[in-house]
Amino acid sequence: MSMGRSSSTTFRNRTASHGSRSLGSAETARIPRKLSSQLSHTHANILHPQLQTMMEQWQMRERPSLETENGKGSLLLSSEGVADMIVLSSFGEVISVVFPWFLANVRTSFDIKLSEFKHQLFEQIGPMKWGKHSTQPQDYAFRQLNNFGEIEVIFNDDQQLSCLELHGTFPMLFLFEPDGFNRDKELMCDISHCLGYSLDKLEESIDEELRQFRASLWTQTKKTCFERGVDGVDHYAFPEEQYFCVGEKCPTDLESKVKAAKLDYQLFWTKRKSEANEVWEKMYKITIDFDPEFNPQSLMRMFVKELQCMNLFDPEDPPDEEWILQLAGRTSFVTRPEISLVSYDGIRSELESYRCPGFVVRRKSLVLKDYVRPKPLYEPHYVRVHERKMALDVLSVSIGTEVKHSGNSDKVWTDFRPTASLEQITLWDLDSNLMIRPVNVTGLPFTASHDIYLGMEFKVYVGTLTLATIKIPRVPTTKLVWKREFFTFDLYMKDMPPSAILSVRVYSMKTTKMKEEIELGWVNISLSDWRDELRQGQIKLNLWGPEPSANRSRIGHNGAKIGTSLSVTVEISSHGRRVKMPNEAQYKYLVDHRISWSDTVEIVGDDYEACIGDPGYKKLQDLVKKHESGVILDDSEQRHVWSWRNYIQKQEPDLLVVLSELRIVWTDRENFSELYVMLETWKAPSVAAALTLLGKRCTDRVIRKFAVNKLNDQLSQFNVHLFLLPLIQALKYEPRAYSEVGMMLLTRALSSYRIGHRLFWLLRSEICRLKDCATNNEEYRRISLLMEAYLRGNEEHIKGIIRQVDMVDELTRISSLVKGLSKEAAREKLRDQLRTISHKMESIDSPLDPVYKFGEMVIEKAIVLGSAKQPLRLVWKNKNPKSDLHLPFCEVIFKNGDDLRQDMLVLQVLEVMDTIWKAANIDCCLSPYGVLPMGEMIGIIEVVPNCKTIFEIQHKAGLVNTAARSVDSNFMNKWIRKQCGFVDEKKKYKKGGGPTVDSAQATKKYFESVDRFLYSCVGYSVATYIMGIKDRHSDNLMLTEDGKYFHIDFGHILGHGKTKLGIQRDRQPFILTEQFLTIIRSGKPVDGNSHEIQKFKTLCLEAYEVMWNNLKYKFQKTLCCKGETKEKARKFFAGVYEEAFNGSWSTKTNWLFHAMKHY
């Protein structure tokens, strides 16, 4: 660097009266050659009025300056002393940079990035430091004068100076210290930390569609944050305990159980100072008798009355202090006056398990300090950039040719491109068939040869239906040239569905084996783009590598070139104008004014009884079964199903899944237009049917939007978390970045912290699987932008999320360190590592469920389990008050090397079933423990306390004894009796006596345990049969000390079990052994006609019937819950039960061999 030198200097204050330099002086009037083409002729010699005013105000400020002998202002620089100009490049242009306290002319190359330009400037002006102004470049941002005469902030420091719009008689940039700018930078840094990837790099890789998507996400974030609760118990983060339904009365069976066990409510209270300091050791206990009519307010009134009777009060409490109830051991509250206490899930579970519900009485004013009103959202820089771009495009359109619109041409997206001035038509204005031609193929995985030919297949499909197919003539790989002619599909453009997908498959063949095709790659793309316009012209597509056809539902090309570098360029015939897809108004117009109607007799569907009595109804049922079995219906059969569309719309809305897979619907615009119009008044389908419509079987955006809207109406804030995993999978089948599924997930996450917390980790585990191809992978970028929007709307909790992310990173590192070590060495290594970093993992929300708070880590209990992946078992103290009544310790298993998504899905289905049964007043005592995937093959599993596997129970010293226990029908019953306090009669105590046993108390505990086992066995028997859970053995069946039975490890579901020599190992429909039946009979010999066994059978049938009634999705019944009517369903499962009851010998044999193998 060099700069012009001057003579002696004086550093002093001066104002405008001391000969300050004019900003419009001749010295600064040079215009960079590179920018000359950008300057407006009208602004060449006239300074902008707003800029002139700003400069006049700036010149009247008090500021420092240097004066030389000739009186000219100068700069005091770090490297060269005094100079009149900062020279960063000898051959650059001159630009004026206005600092907050002085002005400097700078000669620089316009190829330099703004970040580097700013850094070099501040390296030079260190001696010019003045007053409170910082000289750190990161504290400043640039501003410039834009095309509209506005001073705007430049947020992207990675762009070059040549990209800026510098106007006026000379180019100028302004530096300022923004208040919100640093906040945005810090927030972006925090979000990058949470994502595990830089937002700056992500911004560089997103295209126009993703920029629009990002702006739409921000709009939805702002709208949701404005509408969500932010005060008191309505705060979006306030943890209200899940409840079943409003106005529900206490079930009779539950009331009888509570009275028999003499259960009551236990409330704990402490002084204000102790509560404020979170000191819970000394608490007063008040017991209140159970009343099935109690709600939170009535229980609270009883508590206050008891408090007054005991003369307990705190003088520090104000007279108007309000109280709320917190469940013992959980950050979960019960506050709703319209909800009875027995309707709350946590309270109901305690009562069903013969435990007294415990509450901590909290002061509302202290509790709500943790749920303050969030600070206003800070509008991110990309929103202002996007709005500016839209405004510029509007200006471009306004000075162009007026846009010609055809009738009813409402736009799906507001289009502000300059090309919007081109004439626009709709798809229905075209009078031709779809035409495509191949252009070239690159990136072949082999050397070109005269003996190898290349072929290409084009297919247009919707959902599971192929509408048209063309195979292109093969050409030698040495000359990959096709004739310049288009191939015409048998698909009339007017009848092409708006969500039609083009599939391209490339294959090779050898001249010696011309009948054998070797697939090289494939790709699917929507024939309409994100603006809802028909794709036209040449398109280059990166192909995906060969996969089974069942996995080819992915829409979008392989931007990251995962697995293959093969790409193909195709050309879709152009029509000289922009072609929009039809819109809602056009569909309605066509349906109202169509000329011809189908000759098929239509069923109105209003009278249900008349419809099911129609002979055609039986045929409809048969055709639905035929369709679901995989048989393709012929045209006459499809027309029969279609003729029942009005009945289906009003009476059996789930059959929309079948209608959406009829070919006659998607090959005639009259039919799919009518279906679209009918959706406006379509009865809501079941949750199961809506989720099916969001899977890969349906690609139509109108139907998918309908499914999301109906699903959103049916899911409450308390059960939506059960469906997050399938909804995230549904994102992968969306043809465009913007989707109703994504917007629904974002809205729900921002409206409930608990839902958002789980969604964050599920989304993060998805992007971790794609991190190796991050910037070029469309799925990665979509999910990352969705996560960014959530984190921007959840800024209050982002620091807590960062702590959890850091915890996962540390545990991943430690799990890698202990792999391969012996059991003892691995345990010591784990504990040594935890001693140095455990403080980082304490006083933090549990990633599994934020209602639990990790307190102090119990390092002495940390172990490395002996399985192949060597998972870590970690223990924390539960930091919530009175955790000893519920869960004293939070125990988790951290796994590195297993995909936990299938386990999580099965456990969520179990949780859904549990909710359905409880709503029907059947508590099956299920134990759907928590599982959370947190990265690529990384996740955590909740440990159910005080339990053992059946193998651990039967395991005894010596192989013979262990094998003997496997066939002993009483060994599990003996173990339960021991946990209840009974002493094994065969073990005699030595003289002096043994422990005294309270026989009555032990008997009471034993019968309670038997009751828990009975109901949990009912639940898991029915649930595992419905889901087809296989590979059941004594190492994945668990038993708790209080009698609950449950399953773990769900690697084989939907009937896909292990086989040996072609023979299915699991030959029973569900596990029902003699050991189980012995417990059910309280230790007595098994008798199928006994009262206990008959009760068990009746409960199984009732549980199955409840599930049959709730699985309204008919075709799912053919897979899981068989039986056309309730009577037939009950009869069917009675046969299943008898098969399991009579086949217990096979399970006993499996357990024997499993014990001998793993002893």
UniProtKB/Swiss-Prot annotation:
Residue ranges of every copy of the PI3K-RBD domain listed in the record: 272-363
Ranges where the C2 PI3K-type domain occurs: 430-588
UniProt region (Activation loop), positions on chain: 1047-1073
Keyword Plastid among UniProt keywords: no
Domain PI3K/PI4K catalytic intervals: 858-1159
GO cellular component: cytoplasm; phosphatidylinositol 3-kinase complex; plasma membrane
Homology family: Belongs to the PI3/PI4-kinase family.
Function according to Swiss-Prot or TrEMBL: Phosphatidylinositol 3-kinase homolog that regulates longevity and diapause. Promotes cell survival during embryonic development by recruiting akt-1/2 to the plasma membrane through the production of PtdIns(3,4,5)P3. Could function in the development or neuroendocrine signaling of the dauer pathway. Mediates susceptibility to enteropathogenic E.coli infection. May negatively regulate AYI interneuron neurite outgrowth. Plays a role in aversive olfactory learning when an odor is associated with food deprivation.
Protein name: Phosphatidylinositol 3-kinase age-1
Organism whose genome encodes this protein: Caenorhabditis briggsae
